[in-house]
Curated annotation (Swiss-Prot):
Coiled coil: none annotated. This is Integration host factor subunit beta. Belongs to the bacterial histone-like protein family. It comes from Klebsiella pneumoniae (strain 342). Heterodimer of an alpha and a beta chain. The keyword DNA-binding applies. One of its GO terms (cellular component) is chromosome. This protein is one of the two subunits of integration host factor, a specific DNA-binding protein that functions in genetic recombination as well as in transcriptional and translational control. InterPro entries: Hist_DNA-bd, Histone-like_DNA-bd_CS, IHF-like_DNA-bd_dom_sf, IHF_beta. GO terms for biological process: DNA recombination; regulation of DNA-templated transcription; regulation of translation. Pfam families: Bac_DNA_binding.
Length: 95
């Protein structure tokens, strides 16, 4: 599901709220979550999961085109850990 698909689905379920208001709310929520993570803070949504930053240590990588070794700096990357309720709901899914 993309961001625009999420907005469309929420707008169709909440017909009393203008689609533009739903779009603005979703964009504002995502922007607030991104800025919270950028400040190094953890986000926890009970029953859904938590977002945090994990540190990746410096390492030697490879350029996929040339195969040459490349030194990669350490960096922080976003990490999502699903909550128990989300894990349980996703576990029922069968292809």
């Amino acid at each position: 599901m993309t961001k625009s698909e999420l907005i469309e689905r929420l707008a169709s379920q909440q017909s009393h709220i203008p689609a533009k208001a739903v779009e603005d709310a979703v964009k504002e929520m995502l922007e607030h979550m991104a800025s919270t993570l950028a400040q190094g803070e953890r986000i926890e949504i009970r029953g859904f999961g938590s977002f945090s930053l994990h540190y990746r240590a410096p390492r030697t990588g490879r350029n996929p085109k040339t195969g040459d070794k490349v030194e990669l700096e350490g960096k922080y990357v976003p990490h999502f850990k699903p909550g128990k309720e989300l894990r349980d709901r996703a576990n029922i899914y069968e292809e």
